[in-house]
């Protein structure tokens, strides 16, 4: 600020009154992700789809190096839990959200003392009803725990991208 006011030949009060925004960039978020210092996050997915983070759409950093280990997912497998529900690709409900299945998952996350929960159900970008219901239940049963749903964070068709973006969003809260 001082350098810029000197360059313009005005005082700081005048400079700030004419300033629309001040942007400050850091690597704090990037460092937190790389060093895995984010929030302890749980993931709720459609039953049978908790490993999408490890499958990564089959992509590898070096596709021809079979010995190159993939980086560990931001959410360990024991904190990735399946919930019985299913939305079809066209947005129609195939299987209603099973509250018993959801309650079991919530109890496990409570036991593990997670500080945030990501919810990413199949095809929620088309029909977010189950994710929205899950968010309301989580907020009631796990007060103080941050909750993000993929249909709000990144409502796009690709499952891996929705899951990973929602998790990164929560990891940095």
Regions found by a protein language model. Name each.
Residues 3-173:
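N-terminally biased helix-coil "hinge/interface" segments that flank
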